[in-house]
């Protein structure tokens, strides 16, 4: 262990003075914590808001899981790390590709770099889809609760996870998938005292339940209890989210609010002349039906761009239509992994491809989803004061390691607990 600052992707990060636990609460619109605290369900967080750092940050757009988790662990926007969504279209091969492969990443993670310098690093995700990218080049522990029973020393740096935690492997579509992460995190912190731990949950609850609802408050109360345990173990606990979440349905009928872009564009310029890609698409579509508030459009004929842009811009529920250059400049995206046009939806509107391509039968509650700038505001909270961090400093969710390592003040007793 060096104890010296580490330079990663052009930025210097101080060595952790106490065990650092960074938590990405998937889909955590700020109102979830606000409502749970107001209801008295998060006493630990209520105390942290008094003594620690409590800010609002902007996530990456598209406000989806993969680009934001990779931004958080690299400290960079997608223009640097290359992950532009959960899913993208490669025009050179004509294939639509899940963005789960570490080969698609263009820079190293803080996690791998700290481990290379001697830090003990642990990564636990809910869904296995993220594990390989978060663990890219990482010499440490990295496993998912989804496949915790399959973890091996060779592949994951740990074995016997289920026995250690004392919980069965949860269903993918459950609150317990996220709880398993925290239960495992506490056990590992007690046993091994890693220097850095990254915990990334699933947004199953947020997709189904609004802020302040009984189920949502129960979920946040559960997390609050585990965070309190990590705090009591002397950890610096830093919280953020990959994106927010909004209702995307008619409040009267519960019907999904959606504009099917592929159907419309085909009607305007003819079938086969455009391809609509929805970067929210991932292997776990039951809770969102692959409907979010961000889409990208590839055009076979560049001369159609003005027509398609004008028509899309006039649609009710469409927030903005940007060219590739405009979108990549505004959202800091890699141009070659974005279409000719980027379309974002209004707060309560989703964007689909063709109506017959979306199976909404799994939506047991009115749709809540994300993807656009209207889901960009997320919490950034640390259980330490950061007096050197100016109150007007604009923050991103991928500022969380910077704030926690370079600005948060660790008390002497916590430093002692880290030894």
Set out the residue ranges of the language-model regions.
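Short, structured active-site-proximal loop/turn typified by the sulfatase FGly-forming signature C/S-X-P-X-R
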Residues: 34-75, 122
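Structural motif
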Residues: 22-24, 196-200, 238, 342, ...
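Active-site-proximal N-terminal segment of extracellular/periplasmic enzymes that hydrolyze or transfer
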Residues: 1-53
């Amino acid at each position: 262990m060096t104890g010296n600052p580490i330079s990663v992707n052009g930025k210097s990060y101080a060595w952790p003075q106490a065990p650092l636990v960074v938590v990405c609460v998937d889909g955590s619109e700020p109102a979830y914590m606000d409502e749970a605290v107001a209801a008295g369900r998060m006493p630990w967080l209520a105390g942290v808001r008094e003594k620690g750092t409590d800010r609002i940050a902007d996530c990456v757009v598209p406000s989806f899981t993969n680009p934001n988790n990779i931004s958080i662990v690299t400290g960079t926007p997608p223009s640097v790390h290359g992950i532009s969504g959960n899913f993208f279209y490669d025009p050179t091969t004509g294939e639509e590709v899940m963005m789960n492969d570490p080969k698609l990443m263009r820079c190293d993670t803080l996690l791998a770099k700290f481990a290379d310098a001697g830090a003990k690093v642990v990564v636990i995700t809910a869904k296995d889809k993220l594990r390989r990218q978060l663990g890219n080049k990482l010499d440490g522990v990295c496993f998912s609760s989804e496949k915790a029973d399959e973890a091996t020393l060779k592949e994951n740096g740990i074995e016997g996870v289920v026995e250690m935690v004392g919980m069965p492997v949860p269903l993918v579509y459950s609150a317990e998938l996220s709880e398993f992460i925290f239960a495992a995190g506490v056990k590992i912190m007690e046993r091994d005292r890693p220097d850095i731990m990254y915990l990334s949950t699933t947004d199953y609850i947020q997709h189904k339940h609004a802020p302040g609802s009984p189920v949502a408050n129960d979920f946040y109360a559960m997390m609050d209890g585990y965070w309190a345990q990590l705090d009591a173990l002397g950890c610096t606990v830093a919280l953020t989210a990959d994106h927010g979440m909004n209702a995307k349905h008619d409040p009267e009928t519960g019907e999904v609010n959606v504009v099917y872009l592929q159907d419309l564009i085909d009607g305007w310029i003819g079938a086969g002349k455009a391809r609509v890609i929805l970067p929210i698409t991932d292997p776990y579509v039951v809770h969102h039906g692959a409907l979010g508030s961000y889409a990208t459009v590839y055009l076979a004929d560049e001369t159609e761009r003005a027509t398609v842009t004008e028509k899309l811009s006039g649609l009710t529920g469409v927030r903005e239509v940007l060219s590739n250059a405009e979108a990549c400049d505004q959202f800091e995206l890699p141009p070659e992994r974005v279409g000719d046009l980027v379309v974002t939806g209004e707060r309560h509107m989703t964007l689909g491809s063709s109506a017959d391509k979306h199976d909404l039968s799994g939506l047991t509650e009115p749709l809540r989803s994300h993807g656009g700038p209207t889901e960009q505001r997320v919490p950034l909270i640390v259980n330490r004061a950061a007096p050197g961090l100016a109150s007007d400093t604009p923050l991103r969710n991928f500022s969380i390691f910077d704030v926690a390592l370079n600005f948060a003040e660790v008390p002497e007793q916590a430093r002692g607990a880290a030894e």
